């Protein structure tokens, strides 16, 4: 059911369910063009500013507990704060594609936000376009040891000035770092050992493209990445 508010403003909405948590979507009044309700895209483009509690257990249309938070907060431009226990009700998520992409008001992220997620394989575009983000915690991916793709995970995060050297230390299964730092225009240097623990990488395509202030690239940056086959547009 679609409910349209007559006047713009702030509304307190309470949602209850006698069974599975319902699939819902929030839309701006003039943007609605039909149901865009897919799994956990609960807050898609919503004007949410803060989240205080963990996401409750959600189920898909087949009654199975969700295993993906793809696009959940995509384009929530007003979202300012994310609790570190946001996903604490889950321990079997496999994908966080575009989860916080273009959440342009987020300035920080807890290093423990993905601590329970040991089965994740994809962080593609998770924080893409979060240009107000000031830093990325060094241990944010520490417990996500099954990840195979960090495609554009923090691309276009133009507020970042530093890349932690051990950011991917525990992600030894990664094969894809394409566009990983693409558009991080304030970063001036790359840590020499940032990819040292990732021997299975095959693609760095566009990894450092559009990094306008990049000055220093270590000579041994890729010394342990002997399986790489894709480096197109690496710095362009």
Language model features by range: what are they?
Residues 1-236:
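Negatively charged
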């Amino acid at each position: 059911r679609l409910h349209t508010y007559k006047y713009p403003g702030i509304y307190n909405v309470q949602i209850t369910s006698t069974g599975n948590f319902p699939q819902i979507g929030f839309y701006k009044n003039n943007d609605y063009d039909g149901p865009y309700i897919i799994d956990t895209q609960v807050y898609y483009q919503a004007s949410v500013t803060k989240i205080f509690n963990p996401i409750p257990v959600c189920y898909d249309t087949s009654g199975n507990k969700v295993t993906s938070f793809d696009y959940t907060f995509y384009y929530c431009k007003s979202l300012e704060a994310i609790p570190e226990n946001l996903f604490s009700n889950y321990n079997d998520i496999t994908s966080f594609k575009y989860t916080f992409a273009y959440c342009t008001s987020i300035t920080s992220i807890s290093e423990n936000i993905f601590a329970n997620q040991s089965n994740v394989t994809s962080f593609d575009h998770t924080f893409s376009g979060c240009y107000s983000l000031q830093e990325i915690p060094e241990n944010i991916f520490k417990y996500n040891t099954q990840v195979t793709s960090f495609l554009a995970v923090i691309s276009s995060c133009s507020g970042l000035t530093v890349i932690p050297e051990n950011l991917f230390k525990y992600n030894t299964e990664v094969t894809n770092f394409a566009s990983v730092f693409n558009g991080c225009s304030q970063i001036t240097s790359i840590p020499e050992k940032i990819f040292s623990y990732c021997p299975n990488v095959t693609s760095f395509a566009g990894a450092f493209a559009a990094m306008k202030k990049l000055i220093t690239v270590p000579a041994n940056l890729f010394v342990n990445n002997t399986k790489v086959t894709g480096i197109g547009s690496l710095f362009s």
